[in-house]
């Protein structure tokens, strides 16, 4: 057993001292590869064994591409702003900056212990003013292009966290209560002024962009469903005995003749004007009741509730008078906050009508049981009788548009991005307010985050930055301004950090994002070729970063519409019992312990050998032991060469070794290109078995095997390569396979008589048919089987078979 601790520390020091993995950007090399990990939040807990899975995958790709002559960008950085850091600071009575930097050092050391080929001169930190200067600059551009504004909106307020949360940061707990994703604290709806980024304006571009990238279908579906585009019609219904109108959205305008009631969201502002005196108390009580229910619960397939508003509307198509109901299954933040009730042709409407004894009118000819939502010819529908859905919708849309009663519209489930947080540890907004609350944008960036010792969030929603009196007020040209005291969310820095790696210079500075030099670099390095991270970021981070990147494309900063060409979500590493690792279950495994007992190379190769990268699989100590034994076997092979026969010319090795060698290189290459990392390891194992079996080696072959091994077990590969070489194995060239040498030259041909196998012969590949027949007939066993019987027919397939019919 080799001393992994000694070997791994030796080579980690060598790589750092010699800057082995220093980023290379050769202007004469058109081959580039940008492989990226979703950068970590540097928590005090450090890495667990799940982290190295994705990092090792990108490391294998990075090393492999470098061997193949690519300029490779494989960077690392820290997503260090945000709620988790601030919460931990409050709990431990520390300043977030102090322990964040301490945690980064711990994380960096752990990454170095695993042997990743990061160039740490390219490292980025979202809390670095040189970094967040450009986060602020992007916000300024969004504001200038009318994509950032302050709105009075109902927000998700978490009193325990003292901040507003985006819709995506709110989840349901076991009791179906709305809580914060981080910490599980109660969340309520509360009206507040907030900065909002208008991501909905980019909904169609984000949908279209999915056609240009290589994401899994499940990942694309998650994004499409989150955006939730629906095409329909907005129809104006007049309110009876009023000058008011109500805009109602429907995707089935063809069923408008079957409308028996309208339903509005409890938050709809029209209720204040149309609710009858008799129903005011009932409606108000229902509104208060709804505030306690989550949006997810409201739209869930459960028993629907509602109350009558006391008001009526007039159907613009047939002038029928229909009641207006209030129900929590209609959300104000989707479409118009009002829908048609067509119980004959919608399951939800049908259940609602049955519950409240509302009439049901069928307008599609069907023999099926109601409710029927399929296609068919329309009945009881005047101008569209006898038409199918598509025909009916065309006729009705034309009529409504012509008569100014409606229009075709697209609606989205996607909500605009609430972009401000009432917390301290985040990027300050480059925004000032004058005495009249008029906005002045700060162009001189960065706006630095002041050093506060007291940063506990208030219960009122006032940001801790309001306490920074010296920082808070600014005088410009004799006019006094107050700074924006909210900060940006953690998602801000992660929405563009992949560009920062390209801009980061060796001296620690950043090339300006809006410079010509930046454009030159982006032209070569974008998009990211492969981006690997957990599926938990499949919607939020991925959607936000795609939005920012597409915006930067639109204003001419970047040359690509999409930031990432291929995204892979790695599966989790579960506990031995197939449960998710957690402290409470006591099944968390620290990679430091594995490195100490088995070595970093063993950890790397085991996590890549567990199965497909995208699969979630249980940790298996036996599998870990098996990988260590295999690495020991490789080590022994190179230290026991005196027991093996050495052949100077690789091409003069026996056929089995030559075939195995070229097959290894071919299959290894294919496996890594397809991210089938476990298959590449299997191929290396098969090859080592062949070497042990034959007891014959060649030094070129042994060197080339170590080049392949270096992608997975770089420390051991370096150590063994250094036995005969002074340069790093990681900087060598990928060996090339010869397709012709994968094909065996000596092959076995079966000989059949009347279709039954009687004998085989060994011949050279491509031996012609005549020669094959002669060789077959020369075999004693074949001669005995045929005897004196005449051969009626001989069937010969070169390289395959010989069959004599007698």
UniProtKB/Swiss-Prot annotation:
Record-listed ATP binding positions: 583
Keywords (alphabetical) are: Aminoacyl-tRNA synthetase, ATP-binding, Cytoplasm, Ligase, Nucleotide-binding, Protein biosynthesis
**Which InterPro entries does this entry report, sorted A to Z?**
aa-tRNA-synth_I_CS, Leu-tRNA-ligase, Leu_tRNA-synth_edit, M/V/L/I-tRNA-synth_anticd-bd, Methionyl/Leucyl_tRNA_Synth, Rossmann-like_a/b/a_fold, tRNAsynth_Ia_anticodon-bd, Val/Leu/Ile-tRNA-synth_edit
UniProt GO cellular component terms = cytosol
Q: CDD domains under this entry?
A: Anticodon_Ia_Leu_BEm (cd07958), LeuRS_core (cd00812)
User: Which reaction is recorded as catalysed by this protein?
Assistant: tRNA(Leu) + L-leucine + ATP = L-leucyl-tRNA(Leu) + AMP + diphosphate
Instruction: State if Hydrolase is listed as a keyword.
Output: no
User: Is this entry keyworded Nucleotide-binding?
Assistant: yes
Per the UniProt entry, the Enzyme Commission number(s) are 6.1.1.4
Q: What class of enzyme is it?
A: ligase
Molecular functions per Gene Ontology: aminoacyl-tRNA deacylase activity; ATP binding; leucine-tRNA ligase activity
SUPFAM superfamilies of this UniProt entry?
Answer: Anticodon-binding domain of a subclass of class I aminoacyl-tRNA synthetases, Nucleotidylyl transferase, ValRS/IleRS/LeuRS editing domain
Q: Where is this motif: 'HIGH' region?
A: 40-51
Protein location: Cytoplasm
What's an example GO BP annotation here?
leucyl-tRNA aminoacylation
One of the Pfam families matching this protein, by short name: tRNA-synt_1g
Motif: 'KMSKS' region; annotated at 580-584
Q: Which PANTHER family match?
A: LEUCINE--TRNA LIGASE, MITOCHONDRIAL (PTHR43740:SF2), LEUCYL-TRNA SYNTHETASE (PTHR43740)
Q: Which family does it belong to?
A: Belongs to the class-I aminoacyl-tRNA synthetase family.
**What is this protein called in UniProt?**
Leucine--tRNA ligase
| Organism annotation | Ureaplasma parvum serovar 3 (strain ATCC 700970)
């Amino acid at each position: 057993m080799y001393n992994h601790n000694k070997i791994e520390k030796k080579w980690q020091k060598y790589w750092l001292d010699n800057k082995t993995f220093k980023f290379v950007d050769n202007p004469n090399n058109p081959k580039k590869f940008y492989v990226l990990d979703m950068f970590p939040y540097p928590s005090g807990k450090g890495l667990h064994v799940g982290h190295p899975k994705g990092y090792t995958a990108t490391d294998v790709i990075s090393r492999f591409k470098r061997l193949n002559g690519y300029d490779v960008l494989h960077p690392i950085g820290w997503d260090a702003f945000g709620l988790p850091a601030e919460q931990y600071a409050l709990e431990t009575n520390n300043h977030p900056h102090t322990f964040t930097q301490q945690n980064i050092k711990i994380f960096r050391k752990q990454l170095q212990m695993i042997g990743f080929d990061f160039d740490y001169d390219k490292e980025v930190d979202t809390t670095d003013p040189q970094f967040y200067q450009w986060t602020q600059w992007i916000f300024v551009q969004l504001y200038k292009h009318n994509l950032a504004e302050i709105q009075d909106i109902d927000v998700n307020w978490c009193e325990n966290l003292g901040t507003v949360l985006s819709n995506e940061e709110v989840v349901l707990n076991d009791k179906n209560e709305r809580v914060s994703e981080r910490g599980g604290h109660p969340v309520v709806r509360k009206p507040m002024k907030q900065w909002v980024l208008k991501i909905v304006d980019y909904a169609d571009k984000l949908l279209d962009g999915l056609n240009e990238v290589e994401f899994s279908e499940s990942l694309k579906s998650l994004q499409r469903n989150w955006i939730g585009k629906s095409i329909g019609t907005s129809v104006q219904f007049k309110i009876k005995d009023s000058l008011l109108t109500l805009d109602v959205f429907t995707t089935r305008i063809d069923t408008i003749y079957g409308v028996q009631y309208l339903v509005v969201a409890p938050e709809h502002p029209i209720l204040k004007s149309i609710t009858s005196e008799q129903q005011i108390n009932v409606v108000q009580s229902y509104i208060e009741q709804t505030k306690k229910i989550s949006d997810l619960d409201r739209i869930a397939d459960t028993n629907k509730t509602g109350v009558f508003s006391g008001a009526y509307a007039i159907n613009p198509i047939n002038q029928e008078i229909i009641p207006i109901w209030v129900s929590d299954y209609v959300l104000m933040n989707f479409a118009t906050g009002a829908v048609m009730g067509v119980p004959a042709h919608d399951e939800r409407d049908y259940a609602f009508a049955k519950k409240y004894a509302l009439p049901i009118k069928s307008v599609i000819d069907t023999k099926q049981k109601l409710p029927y939502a399929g296609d068919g010819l329309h009945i009881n529908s005047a101008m569209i009788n006898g038409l199918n859905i598509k025909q009916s919708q065309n006729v009705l849309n034309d009529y409504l548009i012509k008569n100014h009663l409606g229009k075709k519209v697209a609606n989205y489930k996607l909500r605009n991005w609430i972009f401000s947080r009432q917390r301290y540890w985040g990027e300050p907004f480059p925004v000032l307010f004058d005495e009249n609350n008029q906005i002045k944008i700060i162009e001189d960036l960065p706006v630095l985050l002041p050093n506060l010792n007291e940063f506990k969030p208030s219960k009122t929603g006032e940001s801790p930055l309001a306490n920074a009196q010296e920082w808070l007020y600014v005088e410009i040209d004799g006019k006094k301004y107050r700074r924006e005291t909210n900060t940006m969310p953690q998602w801000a820095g992660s929405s563009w950090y992949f560009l920062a790696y390209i801009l980061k210079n060796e001296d620690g500075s950043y090339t300006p994002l809006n410079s010509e030099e930046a454009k030159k670099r982006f032209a070569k390095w974008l998009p990211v070729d492969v981006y690997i991270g957990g599926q938990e970021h499949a919607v939020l981070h991925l959607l936000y970063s795609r939005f920012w990147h597409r915006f930067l494309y639109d204003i001419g900063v970047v040359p690509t519409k999409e930031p990432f060409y291929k995204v892979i979500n790695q599966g989790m590493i579960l506990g031995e019992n197939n449960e998710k690792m957690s402290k409470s279950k006591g099944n968390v495994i620290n990679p430091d312990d594995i490195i100490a007992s088995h070595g970093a190379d063993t950890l790397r190769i085991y996590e890549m050998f567990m199965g497909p990268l995208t699969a979630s699989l249980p940790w298996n100590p036996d599998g870990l032991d098996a990988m260590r034994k295999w690495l020991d076997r490789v080590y022994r092979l190179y230290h026991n060469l005196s027991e093996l026969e050495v052949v100077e010319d690789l091409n003069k090795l026996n056929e089995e070794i030559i075939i195995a060698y070229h097959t290894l290189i071919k299959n290894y290459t294919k496996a890594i290109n397809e991210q089938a990392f476990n298959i590449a390891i299997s191929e290396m194992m098969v090859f080592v078995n062949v070497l042990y079996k034959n007891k014959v080696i060649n030094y070129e072959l042994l060197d080339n095997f170590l080049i392949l091994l270096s992608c997975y077990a770089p420390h051991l590969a370096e150590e063994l390569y250094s036995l005969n070489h002074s340069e790093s194995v990681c900087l060598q060239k990928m060996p090339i396979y010869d397709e012709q040498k994968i094909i065996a030259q000596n092959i076995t041909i079966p000989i059949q008589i009347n279709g039954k196998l009687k004998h085989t012969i060994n011949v050279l590949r491509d031996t012609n048919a005549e020669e094959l027949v002669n060789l077959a007939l020369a075999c004693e066993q074949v001669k005995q089987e045929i005897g004196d019987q005449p051969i009626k027919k001989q069937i010969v397939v070169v390289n395959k078979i010989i069959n004599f019919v007698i």
